[in-house]
Amino acid sequence: MNAKVVVVLVLVLTALCLSDGKPVSLSYRCPCRFFESHVARANVKHLKILNTPNCALQIVARLKNNNRQVCIDPKLKWIQEYLEKALNKRFKM
């Protein structure tokens, strides 16, 4: 085989092997880029706390009335109280 063909073939195969998975820009993106700050506690069916190494605290709520998922601002007073109560319950001796 011609040396140029071998080099091109090796480069193409290397590029294919390195391109597996998501692009770096997508794999490090935080799930919650925008927060809802006017979500009533009574309207929340379920809360999910996302723990990602490269993002701040992120809380996703499933709403009762339309089953929609929204990211809730973790600075809301009722969220702070909920988290404090959950942590106290978990680490209570």
From Swiss-Prot:
Family matches, as SMART domains: SCY
Q: Where is this region: Receptor binding?
A: 39-41, 48-50, 60-70
Distribution of this protein across tissues and organs: Isoform Alpha and isoform Beta are ubiquitously expressed, with highest levels detected in liver, pancreas and spleen. Isoform Gamma is mainly expressed in heart, with weak expression detected in several other tissues. Isoform Delta, isoform Epsilon and isoform Theta have highest expression levels in pancreas, with lower levels detected in heart, kidney, liver and spleen.
Pfam families named among the record's database cross-references: IL8
Please give the annotated consequence of changing residue 64 to E: Loss of integrin activation
**Disulfide bonds listed in the record:** 30-55, 32-71
The entry's stated outcome for residue 37 to A is: No effect on anti-HIV-1 and chemotactic activities
Where does the secretion signal sit in this chain? Answer: 1-21
Q: How is it modified after translation?
A: Processed forms SDF-1-beta(3-72) and SDF-1-alpha(3-67) are produced after secretion by proteolytic cleavage of isoforms Beta and Alpha, respectively. The N-terminal processing is probably achieved by DPP4. Isoform Alpha is first cleaved at the C-terminus to yield a SDF-1-alpha(1-67) intermediate before being processed at the N-terminus. The C-terminal processing of isoform Alpha is reduced by binding to heparin and, probably, cell surface proteoglycans.
Which sites bind heparin?
A: 41-51, 62, 69, 85
**Protein location:** Secreted
One of its GO biological process terms is: defense response
Q: What is the annotated quaternary arrangement, including any partners?
A: Monomer or homodimer; in equilibrium. Dimer formation is induced by non acidic pH and the presence of multivalent anions, and by binding to CXCR4 or heparin. Monomeric form is required for full chemotactic activity and resistance to ischemia/reperfusion injury, whereas the dimeric form acts as a partial agonist of CXCR4, stimulating Ca2+ mobilization but with no chemotactic activity and instead acts as a selective antagonist that blocks chemotaxis induced by the monomeric form. Interacts with the N-terminus of ACKR3. Interacts with integrin subunit ITGB3 (via the allosteric site (site 2)). (Microbial infection) Interacts with molluscum contagiosum virus protein MC148.
What is the name listed in the Swiss-Prot or TrEMBL entry for this protein?
Stromal cell-derived factor 1
Q: Which organism's genome codes for this protein?
A: Homo sapiens (Human)
